Structures are given as C-alpha cells and as structure tokens.
Amino acid sequence: MRARQSIRGGAGALAARGVGKGDRVLVYLPMIPQAHIAMLACARLGAVHSVVFGGFAPRELASRIDDAAPDVVLTCSGGIEPKRRVEYLPAVAEALETAAHPVRTVLVHHREGFETALADVDGRGGASWEDWGEAVAAAEPADCVPVKATDPLYVLYTSGTTGKPKGVVRDNGGHAVALRWTMEHIYDVGPGQAMCTASDVGWVVGHSYIVYGPLLAGATTVMYEGKPVGTPDAGAFWRLIEDHGVRSFFTAPTALRAIRRADPEGELLQAHDLSSLRHFFAAGERLDPETQRWIEGLLGMPVIDHWWQTETGWAIAANPVGLEQLPVKIGSSSVPSPGVDLVVLDGLGEPVPAGTEGNIALRLPLPPGTLPTLWRDDQRYIDSYLSAFPGHYATGDSGVVDEDGYVFVLGRTDDVINVSGHRLSTGVLEAALASHPAVAECAVIGVADPLKGQRPSGYVVLKSGVPVPEPGSEAEAALLDELRQAVRRDVGPVADFRDVVVVDALPKTRSGKILRKTMRQMADGEEYSVPSTIEDSAVLEALAGVLRPAR
C-alpha cells in the first residue's frame, strides 16, 4: 500500500509538471526505492521512462537526453560505491548544459552525505530544479492512464556502444505477457515469494526482474545497492538470501567470479541459512564451466545459466524450471524459450549441422516482449538486426546447438579469432585457462600477427590468497607454462597459444562484461574509445603497457 501511494504521488508530481501519455522522463538514479517508484510513476501516466545507469559521465547522459528528448529528469544527490560517493547533481547539470534538447524540470531526491545541494545547481541548464519530496507532497495523486498494448513503456540504451546510442523500445502489452509467463515458468516465482536479482535498474535485467516481473507475479523483489564483494564482504549475497527468504536468486557470472576470487573456499557461505533458496540463475555474459562447477559445489544445486539481450527483454534460451527442470549441461544456456525459433547459420545464412559453430539468429517473427524497433530510428533497427540474414533477427552472438537442442553461446561474433585459417572462440580458450586452480577470471583476445593473421593473447586474474609471482621469476615461468599447457590440453596445438600474462584486474562495463574489443584495439595499436559504461577506467590504463605482447 505504501508503495502504491508513493507511485500515485510520484505520478501526480510528474503530471503537475506537464508530463502525460507518450512524454519521456529520464531517470538517473542508483539502486534505491525511488528508482522503482519513478519507473512505475511514469508507467501509471503512460509516459515513457528512459533509465540511465547512475554515475554515467555527463557527455553520455547528454547524448541520451538529446535522443530521448525528455521533459523531466528524475535524479538524486548521489550514489554510494564501496570506496566512494558519486555526486550526481554536478553531472546532471553539466549534461543539461551540453545537451541540445532543453529539459524543463529536474526533480531531485535528497540523500544525506553528499556535498552538492539543490541550491548549488538551481537554474543550470535552463531547467527548474525542484525537491522531489516536496513536489510529491504538494501533488494530487494520479490515476492510471489507459494505453495500447503497442504503446511504448520505456526506452533503454544499450551498453558499450559508441557514437549515437541505440534506444531499445519496449512496448506495454507484449512485455507484460512475457514477463508474467517467465516469472512462473522460467524462474518459478509466484505470489508472496521472494526473488532477488543482483543487477541494477539501469540495465535490462533490472527493468525485467527487479521492477516489472516480480510486480506482475505478485512476488516480493529485493533491491540491493551493494556489490557482491566489499559491502562488506563476499558473503553479501548469502546474507540477502537468508535475510529475505529468497526463493530464486539471479546474478551475473562476473559477480560469481568476484566472490570466488575473494572467498575461493566458500567459507562465508557456511554462516548463512539458505534453506529458502530453490533456484540460482546466471546471465549477462558467458558462464565459464569452471565457475559454474565451483558455485554448484558450494550451493549443492544446479546453477541455471540462461541467455538473453537488452533487445529481447527476456530469455532467448532458458531452463523452464517452473514447468519441469531439464538436465543442466555445463556451459549451456539450455533450450530456446517458447516462441523463439532459434537457428545457427553460416556466413551465407545457411543452417549448419548440430554441433557446428555459427551465427545464432532468430527466425521472424520475434515473440512478445522483444523490441519492435529502435527509438526514432526504424532504419537503424533494420540495418542492425534484420539485414545480415534476411528473415532473421541477428543476435550478434556465435554458438552451437547440440543434438539434444541445447544452446551453447560461445561469445560475440567479433570475439571469434582466426589463427592460420582456424576459427577459434575466445570462450573456449578462456574456459581452458579458467580450469587452472589458481585462476579467478580471465580474458582472451586475438591480436594481429603478420604470419598467422591473429594470435590468441590471454590475461588472467589470480584468486585471492594465490601469490602473484614476480615478473621474470621461475615461479612466473612455471605458472605461465601451466596455463599454456591447459589450453593445449583442452583446445589443442591449433590454438598456438603462447602469450599469457597475469594482471590485477580486467576492464569491464558496469554490467560485468569484459571489454575484449577495446583490449584488442589497444593491443593492435588501433584507435579506440573508452566505453561510457566502463566500471573503472584505471584498470584499462594499467593494462596499456601489457596489452601488446612480444612477437
């Protein structure tokens, strides 16, 4: 009831500032309840929300303001990271001054502990800056506005892109139908039960399974502003499960690798009662087999890997545990979801035999809940997704479907490297490196080679407690040789795997995806842009000296 009152009040505050059906509202908030309230307040009015990950740089925020053309921006004083506080108001003010599109109003939720006050930014960017709490208190609560099933609910900009951002459009009707179905049949969560999705509302996972999915199912959703490690330790997820009686938990593989690195023996898990937990899900990037086996061993239950994209809004391939759980195959996202006609094609668009790697595509039409277009750019939608293989949606991922119909996603198509004419998936090479007991996580890229075209180059992060050998020492030479032998054993000499180095950390987006393309561009001496979604640019800077391996 309190949530409903807050949403009605928030919708009333927006309506009082001229926001109505079809108008856009940009939401720039961290993982706090006000983000959830803001999104649902927009939906109540038929307005289109566009959530931007809290902490994005002003330039990137400005580009999204120009594309979405919002009337109102909803933000707060700042966000809290494990080692710092991020001031939001100066970033919003700079973005408004940079953007060509004029924003009428900025509503600000006050949080204690931040330096910038509302008065410090008042009037900047030509906008009216107002206190959110005061605006809600003074507003008349708003009723729901009817919308068509095909009216847009939100626009969400994809991460890791350069140039003009791609605004994925989600419609109302298909989205609601798909999420309601998946909550019951994929995640096995119903009324009164709790689901915890350790993501962010700035990403599609947060939209679908922190905000809308649990609401449509009548379930409890757990919002968590912290991190898998460091807030306060690597037992944070286990504490959430115990404290809130979580039935289904959903996170990204990068979080699991971070926990494994900090607590490789899983000692912190032992202090918590996880008896409520029935299912543990992973998605967002490839779940390497070594990490999957590790977490399964700790939990004593299968880890359900599944695969989807910002564009699809829900799982392309999944294990329907709410219907009947299928046997789990390590490294597989299970089987195509109902309504998804998944095929694997060669470069000419012809289907390949079972067990053969190729381009993963979806035969049209796409199922409910997937993107109908890109915001104000139908032609870019056609060019980006529908042109490579006519009659199909091109996922941009490569993979294999085995004889049992299980899908194995091996990586983005630009993550396939060509060594002397042999196409090798970086995912396969990374799985071999990750099998070494000292490795917490790793990345492999293809670097230019004058003789072979490309050579694989590996970068590994060691587990917590494993000593990092001195450069040039016998210990380092022994470790690197073991890593080379692991690849030779699992992949074969065809990989010609020689270049491998130990690093402190890998560069990632805030959603946990490793920036392999940027690493490859740096290694090859190409021009590159640091993606706006990068979690810590200092990690990339630290790698600059090691990304070009010796020839």
Per-range role (PLM):
Residues A13-A62, A194-V201:
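Conserved AMP-binding/adenylate-forming
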Residues V27, V52-G78, V92, E242, ...:
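AMP-binding/adenylate-forming catalytic core of the ANL superfamily
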Residues R44-E134, P253:
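Structural core segment of the AMP-binding/adenylate-forming
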Residues V106-R111, G123-Y157, K164, G174-L179, ...:
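Conserved pre-ATP/AMP-binding loop-to-beta segment of ANL
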Residues A176-A194, V204-R247, R261-D263, E267:
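Conserved AMP-binding/adenylation subdomain of ANL enzymes
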Residues A219, R247-F250, R260-P327, D341, ...:
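Gly/Ser/Thr-rich phosphate-binding loop
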Residues V335-G339, E350-Y385, L424, E527-Y528:
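Conserved ATP/PPi-binding loop(s) of AMP-dependent carboxylate-activating enzymes
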Residues L348-G349, L451, F497, V503-A523:
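Flexible lysine-rich "adenylation lid" loop at the C-terminal edge of ANL adenylation domains
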